[in-house]
Amino acid sequence: MSEQPHRPPTTAPPTAPSAADRRAHMYGKAFAPEYQGELTTLSVNSSLTDVLTAGTAQLRAAERAGAPGEAARSGLAVAEAHRRLGQVAEADRAWKASYRAAREAGDTSAMAWALWSGGTLARQRGALPLARRLLRLAADSGERAGDVVVRGYSLAGLAETGRIQGDYEAVTALHEQLLAEARRRGEARHTVWALEGIAQIHRNTGSYDSAYAMFEEAAEIAAAAEDRRGHAWALRGLADIVSVRDGDTERALGLLAEAEASCRAMNLLGALAYNHKMRGNVLYRAGRYAESRELYTRALEEFDGMDEPRGRALARLGLVKSLARLGREPAETAADLDVLAETLDRIGLRHGRESVRRAREELGLTPTPPPAPAGNRTEESR
């Protein structure tokens, strides 16, 4: 009998890991450094209502025990939960109380974290000069305390404040520095934040392909690290690019629906409001103006409820444009755009007036010239 020919094994060789898999395995699970002391068992995905309940209970226990250090750290979690729930007055009281307790305990690191929380709240409220001042103090305090995490978070807050204002040249290098530091330490949550920030700068300056790639990487890292908040923001960024670059409305809406599920599970009211505003943007670009009007109206109500002036102004701009497309009187639209231009200037958003100018151009309106001050009129106004 002849010898059977040798056959290679039928099992396929192991597949090489994809670039996404390799990136994801560079990082550990996301953690929430703002949950400190006895609250370190809380996770980055803990519901904010659960954080508030646990934080308040621990704060009261620390106060009864006369432990200002623990009161400062549990108070930080309380402040952050209130802030993310849009409860501005409560958040303001909580971060200040946390700072006072940290100062009493002589804990410079806890003082830095309280300042970071206060600066982040100030940015959320549209008080950008105050945000910069508090975040700079937080970064300096963190450096003195040798706490690289709070220093990094505070510098990240400064970078985000500058980015929101449209000062891209000044903060791009800082974003990239923070991204490199986060990658080196394997910090998933901070890496995701930095990637999303740089991606947003690229998107706002028209570099859609690179923005998409960075939002995509951020989404992959966040998913692997179980960072639902970071993942939701990355999906929102991807939806924006898919809509504006590709015109793929249904895919964009699907990404936003996935992000909304995470926002609702964690009770992320601010992120949910921005999700609804983005859904309005997607529908507006698709010419579905009645639907975009409804989403902008919902987002506007949500921003009103949490005293978020930047989100409120941007949602209002979308609503004004939608109403104009649905037949509103041009004079009323023009008057609203004049008010919005002043509002965006007052908040300190450098790109705000340009957004209003583009809206006027898109809608075929001309700006209303401001009245010349008495005794100081130009030659043309005479």
Regions found by a protein language model. Give the residues of each.
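Amphipathic alpha-helical segments of tetratricopeptide repeats
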Residues: 56-60, 96-107, 136-147, 176-186, ...
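Single-residue signature of alpha-solenoid repeat helices
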Residues: 51, 91, 131, 171, ...
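Structural motif corresponding to the intra-repeat A-B loop/turn of tetratricopeptide repeats
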Residues: 45, 65, 85, 105, ...
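"A position-specific structural signal for the A-helix of alpha-solenoid helical repeats
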Residues: 37, 70, 77, 110, ...
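Flexible inter-repeat linkers and adjacent short helices
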Residues: 1-118, 124-127, 337-382
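Residue register of alpha-helical TPR repeats
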Residues: 73, 93, 113, 153, ...
